[in-house]
Amino acid sequence: MIKNPKVLILTAHYGNGHVQVAKTLEQTFRQKGIEDVIVCDLFGESHPFITDITKYLYLKSYTIGKELYRLFYYGVEKIYDKKIASWYANFGRKRLKTLLQVEKPDIVINTFPIIAVPELKKQTGISIPVYNVLTDFCVHKIWIHREVDRYFVATDHVKELMVDIGVPAEQIVETGIPIRSSFELKVNPEIIYTKYQLCKNKKILLIVAGAHGVLGNVKELCQSFMSVPNLQVVVVCGKNEALKQDLLSLQKQNSDALKVFGYVENIDELFRVTSCMITKPGGITLSEAAALQVPVILYKPVPGQENENAMYFERKGAAVVIRDDSEVFAKTEALLQDDVKLLQMKEAMKSIYLPEPAGHIVDAILAENHAEPRHIPIKSPALAQSFT
């Protein structure tokens, strides 16, 4: 039995999802009495300049670089077994070796496809269990390595895809993607309506615009939706202050039709009262929507994992996918007027969701490493005034 195991969680700041999953797992380990947990952005710490450039290109894939990202995502899939695999496998290796020597972790978890650890195991024979937590509803070969001990995945669909490319079924566990614990608590919606000054007698359309301008024509969309009877539009701008200020002028015209927020810490509260949501198809956002059974309208997925996520939710009947700006208003308005369709989508979301994914992942890892978890009950937090 490992007494007080040290856990190293490797992640990367490409979008917020991978880091959020890492933090959720860290909190869950601590909740179960495992205090020695380190979260590390291996690529950012190893090669900050290269990481900054690639993060910039990643964000540009939402606007001017979609074809470039398509080539990267699907191209790497085809040539992964060649030279690029060797280069990528050793990216961050120097920093990793230092981490392993100094921190001496008992367990390593990846929430980003970092294969430096399993590659180091292969080359040096070091003995350390490695776990990959996949953060999308699809799989890319870059996640796969023979020296990974176990994979935790979103659905049985992802498991089937992995088995098809040669991963033994017994190494794959369907747990769902870890989400913030607030999404799994019970909250009185009446308090939410009061807190955010929302109309209980109207349907609510939530638009998650994001900090990087990845959702286009937001102001024009809001103007169109403000004319729809019995609808209140709620826009979360994230840290995009320019967008927030631009939309606040619209809100002043009719605050019953439009509510604008910047960064919302407890965004699960808005999920709980919305009729449907326009967003990008990131794996974590979709998992959170599934947890609260929120029908989603997925805006112009980028080729790659976003597109794969969108197609999966569309096939399951849980999402409407928008591929052209001209479709957004008409398809959204039609959905909002179709209560039967909205209910069917909520049921589809319910069928996708697996409860308490972070807890199941942590319990499985601790059990495999013969570490006894100490359970501390989670208390339901009061609704925080944490939005701007």
From Swiss-Prot:
Gene3D superfamilies, alphabetized: Glycogen Phosphorylase B (3.40.50.2000)
Reactions performed catalytically: a 1,2-diacyl-3-O-(beta-D-glucopyranosyl)-sn-glycerol + UDP-alpha-D-glucose = a 1,2-diacyl-3-O-(beta-D-Glc-(1->6)-beta-D-Glc)-sn-glycerol + UDP + H(+); a 1,2-diacyl-3-O-(beta-D-Glc-(1->6)-beta-D-Glc)-sn-glycerol + UDP-alpha-D-glucose = a 1,2-diacyl-3-O-(beta-D-Glc-(1->6)-beta-D-Glc-(1->6)-beta-D-Glc)-sn-glycerol + UDP + H(+); a 1,2-diacyl-sn-glycerol + UDP-alpha-D-glucose = a 1,2-diacyl-3-O-(beta-D-glucopyranosyl)-sn-glycerol + UDP + H(+)
Pathway stated in the Swiss-Prot or TrEMBL entry: Glycolipid metabolism; diglucosyl-diacylglycerol biosynthesis
E.C. no: 2.4.1.315
Functional summary from the UniProt entry: Processive glucosyltransferase involved in the biosynthesis of both the bilayer- and non-bilayer-forming membrane glucolipids. Is able to successively transfer up to three glucosyl residues to diacylglycerol (DAG), thereby catalyzing the formation of beta-monoglucosyl-DAG (3-O-(beta-D-glucopyranosyl)-1,2-diacyl-sn-glycerol), beta-diglucosyl-DAG (3-O-(beta-D-glucopyranosyl-beta-(1->6)-D-glucopyranosyl)-1,2-diacyl-sn-glycerol) and beta-triglucosyl-DAG (3-O-(beta-D-glucopyranosyl-beta-(1->6)-D-glucopyranosyl-beta-(1->6)-D-glucopyranosyl)-1,2-diacyl-sn-glycerol).
Family the entry assigns: Belongs to the glycosyltransferase 28 family. UgtP subfamily.
Protein name, UniProt field: Processive diacylglycerol beta-glucosyltransferase
A single GO cellular-component term on record: plasma membrane
Subcellular location: Cell membrane
